[in-house]
Every structure is written in C-alpha cells, then in structure tokens.
Amino acid sequence: MAGALFDAAGRVLITQRPPGKALAGRWEFPGGKLHEGEDAFAGLVRELGEELDVEVRSGERLLRYSHAYPERVVWLDMWIVSAWSGEPRGLEGQALKWVELPALPTEDILEADRPIIEALLSLDLGHGNTTGP
C-alpha cells in the first residue's frame, strides 16, 4: 500500500528508492507491504510511521490495482492521507521531494506507480483537503 501526503501548498510527497534496493534512484509514493493479517489502513499507518516518522490519522482509499513485474504480480492499495502530523523525513535512507501535481508525469516514478499519477491528476483535490504541515 502507499499514501499520498499533501503539504499546505498542495504538493504531494514522493520518495526516492535508496542505493542497494531494487530500482534504486527511482521515485515512488511512500508505503510498503502489509504484515500477515494486517488491514490496508493499519499497514499504511505503520509504514508511513516507519518510513517517514509521520502519524497518519485518517485517509481514504483512492484505488486498488495490480501491477505485473517479470517475476510476480502485486496488488497495490493507494490512499489519500487526509489527516497527518509530523515532519516527514527519510528514516530508511530515502530522499524526499514535494512535487506539484502537474509535474508528477515528468518525474522518474516507478511504472507500478503510474496509475496513481493518473488517478491523482483526475481528482479535484483543491487546497486544504488534507491536513499536515
């Protein structure tokens, strides 16, 4: 699962895969894998806390879809994080970047995350629909 966090200016947060990980240097939306028996929202709260040191208070699922890698197919749940607190920082060695929504298609984002860009661009989020720093 992954989450879209927005700042007060309406920019969305993306993270860069650190050296040593598959697809290092590429950008993605922050998130991770569910633990066995964990529901998607609980996993989102845990992952964003572990990766970014933020506390997710609420969110809405944006979409659920599958992506085929050469070795396996994965299911992805994407959430709009509507209320969160803390100052995001890369606790796992990843760089962070706030990006204007219209600029997302020009970023070197993982192919698996491209459907998220399309979904975000189709929304009328406006400013102030999410709460965070």
What are these regions (language model features)?
Residues F29-R61, E100:
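The catalytic Nudix box helix
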Residues R17-G20, V54, I109:
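Short coil/turn segments
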Residues D7, E55-V56, R64-R89, A95-K97, ...:
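Active-site-adjacent beta-strand/loop module that shapes the phosphate/pyrophosphate-binding cleft
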Residues G86, L101-P115:
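C-terminal structural segments of small proteins and small subunits
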Residues M1-V12, K33:
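Conserved N-terminal beta-strand and adjoining loop/helix that marks the start
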Residues A112-P133:
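Charged phosphate-binding loop/patch that engages nucleotide di/tri-phosphates or the phosphate backbone
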Residues A22-G25, W98:
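A conserved beta-turn-beta hairpin within the catalytic core of GNAT-like acetyltransferases
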